[in-house]
Each structure stands twice: as C-alpha cells, then as structure tokens.
Swiss-Prot record:
InterPro entries: Ribosomal_uL5, Ribosomal_uL5_bac-type, Ribosomal_uL5_C, Ribosomal_uL5_CS, Ribosomal_uL5_dom_sf, Ribosomal_uL5_N. This is one of the proteins that bind and probably mediate the attachment of the 5S RNA into the large ribosomal subunit, where it forms part of the central protuberance. In the 70S ribosome it contacts protein S13 of the 30S subunit (bridge B1b), connecting the 2 subunits; this bridge is implicated in subunit movement. Contacts the P site tRNA; the 5S rRNA and some of its associated proteins might help stabilize positioning of ribosome-bound tRNAs. PANTHER family: 60S RIBOSOMAL PROTEIN L11-RELATED. NCBIfam families: PRK00010.1 (NF000585). It comes from Mycoplasma mycoides subsp. mycoides SC (strain CCUG 32753 / NCTC 10114 / PG1). Keywords: Ribonucleoprotein, Ribosomal protein, RNA-binding, rRNA-binding, tRNA-binding. GO terms for biological process: translation. The keyword Heme does not apply. The keyword Ribosomal protein applies. This is Large ribosomal subunit protein uL5. The lineage of its organism: Bacteria, Bacillati, Mycoplasmatota, Mollicutes, Mycoplasmataceae. Part of the 50S ribosomal subunit; part of the 5S rRNA/L5/L18/L25 subcomplex. Contacts the 5S rRNA and the P site tRNA. Forms a bridge to the 30S subunit in the 70S ribosome. Belongs to the universal ribosomal protein uL5 family. GO terms for molecular function: rRNA binding; structural constituent of ribosome; tRNA binding.
Amino acid sequence: MKSRLEIKYKDQIVPELFKELNYKSIMQVPKIQKIVINMGIGDATTDPKKLDAAISELEKLSGQKPIVTKAKKSLAVFKLREGMAIGAKVTLRGKKMYDFLDKLINVALPRVRDFRGVSKTSFDGFGNFTTGIKEQIIFPEVDYDKVIRLRGMDITIVTSAKTNKEAFALLQKVGMPFEK
C-alpha cells in the first residue's frame, strides 16, 4: 500500500510541477530519491552506551536499523582514533521515505519550539536539501522519559532536481514549511 504523500506526489504534484516548470516530458519532473538521517554522537568515544541509546532512537523514528559511522582519521584534540564509532545514519527509500517525510512535515516540525519554518538557503546547488534538528524528542516514537541526553540530527533530502529552484518547488508542493 502506498503512503499518503506518495499518492499526493503522483496524482497532484507531478502534473503541477510539469506545467509550472515547463518540462517537455513528464519524466523530467524532479522526485525525492532518498532521505539520509545522520546523528553524530561525539561522546560515544568515552561511553559506548550513549551510542547504543542513539542507535535505538534512530531505529524507532526511521523504522530500520541504522549503520554505525566510524572516524576516518585520528584526531588527538577530540581523543579520537581512526575506526572509532562516532555516529549513526539511516538511508530511507521508497515507502519508508515517504512515511518519514510525512511524519516530519506534519508531526515533528510543528512540535519544535519557536518554529518559523526551515531555511530556504539549505540547498546545496544540486537540488538536495539539508536541515538540522536540535532535539530528537519532537518525534512521537521517542519516549521523553527514556532519553538520556537530547541529541540533534541532520536530515538530507536527496532529489533528482538539477537546480535549487526545482528542488524548492518540489519540496514546497510536498508541504515543507519554509520560512517566510
């Protein structure tokens, strides 16, 4: 069964973007390819339990098992050795991607304190959008009482758009709340 956002994309957003951006083929209309959720856990070097807690939270809110990210270089300033676990990330595609994006737009972002919208300047020039979240407790799956420490995360939405303008139009139609 397709998610609500995927049905909206195919039935409503694709025809609107096709007309709005004057494409010659319906296949040129940009689509969301994947969403990458990255959580950096700097204090995982001293206490591995913090990494396990972050991994379980990431698994709850994404619906799949995260990959542990390891340090590429040794840095004495951070007491870090090459190969040490320093974070976790999840790549979402397909139905889970649409479900997560729907949850992010309609449930999580409105729960952020003093939320005025996500930045319009968070595009990378190639049609990808990245935003940061300061607290994981905005997601309903994360139990506030079991949270050891408030952690942030980076959410990257990778699209097939060639320019920032196309990606902005796509995400605006999807319902991403951009700042005024």
